[in-house]
Amino acid sequence: MPDAKGRRIALGCEGSANKLGIGIIAHDPITGEALVLSNVRDTFVSPPGTGFLPKDTARHHRAYFVRVAKKALALSGVSISEIDCICYTKGPGMGGPLTSVAVGARTLALLWGKELVGVNHCVGHIEMGRAITGASNPVVLYVSGGNTQVIAYAEQRYRIFGETLDIAVGNCLDRFARTLEISNDPAPGYNIEQLAKQGGRVLLDLPYAVKGMDCSFSGILGRADDLAAQMKAGEPGPDGEPFTPADLCFSLQETVFAMLVEITERAMAHVGSNQVLIVGGVGCNERLQEMMGAMAAERGGSVYATDERFCIDNGIMIAHAGLLAYETGFRTPLDESTCTQRFRTDEVFVKWRD
């Protein structure tokens, strides 16, 4: 039921990858404004040169769920009785981590007598991005470790106009960070970004794979790995000149981001939009925002992006999207509160939008 101020309040649980996030949000019944009450996150960080395995990540989420939930509740300043629903990430994501957090969400729902709402991870990113930036009806570029999609809203669905044909752009960057044995703290993609800022002297030729509004990153990763092996062996680059890890990171970023800008611009022309909203962990990258901004400015448009509190996986986006669905009457029965590693963005009926 609404709190003393008439607000609906939701607690959201996210754990589709290596970040465990729990957040609490309130919706103002008059203005419709979303108010972030708390947004707590804990990240599983693996050693340099390695990725995060599902079993280890799931173990981390199980170990930290209670303390993160307690902290989120304490920071929010609300009581358990004021919370209307418990929202959790249904998918897509890694099976083990998803399941660990879903079990935690079910436990809270049963302990507190609250209703459950399963949320699509991508829709959570989109709705949080719209709420924070004020973007009205943008073309959405969703870029993360597990997803790369160009999306636009139409007829109560977030339609996918283009996507990766193999691996996600974030996965490409993360895997190359392993090749160079770059630290995973705070995130491999962030550390590649910082290293790329030291490059720029050399732009190495890497495969550029765009097919209409779709793109591919496996070929460019393979070529970047080959060049890294040459560099470690002391061999010169294709032009006979030596190159550094910074040059490799710079070249990789410039190429993959140019691909993303191209397919986003094509989608903007197709749907007639002059707004771009960048969501997902890779959306924090300042160079991507800069390149996208230059393209949008040439079209008389604008780019919207959030900071790391909201573009990196978090619980508050799940709470927000879940509460939007809850307010339309959507519920997830306990016996249907499963998880799925495959959950397409356009499968969700977006009842809360016209």
Swiss-Prot record:
- Record note on cofactor: Binds 1 divalent metal cation per subunit.
Cellular component annotations (GO), alphabetically ordered: chromatin; cytoplasm; EKC/KEOPS complex; nucleus
Annotated EC: 2.3.1.234
Which InterPro entries does the record associate with it? ATPase_NBD, Gcp-like_dom, KAE1/TsaD, Kae1_archaea_euk
Which CDD domains does the UniProt entry name for this protein? ASKHA_NBD_OSGEP_like_euk (cd24132)
List the GO biological process terms.
positive regulation of transcription by RNA polymerase II; telomere maintenance via recombination; tRNA threonylcarbamoyladenosine modification
Subunit composition and interactions: Component of the EKC/KEOPS complex composed of at least bud32, cgi121, gon7, kae1 and pcc1; the whole complex dimerizes.
> What NCBIfam families does this protein map onto?
arch_KAE1, gcp_kae1
| Protein family membership | Belongs to the KAE1 / TsaD family.
Q: Identify this protein by name.
A: tRNA N6-adenosine threonylcarbamoyltransferase
**Gene symbol of the encoding locus:** gpe-1
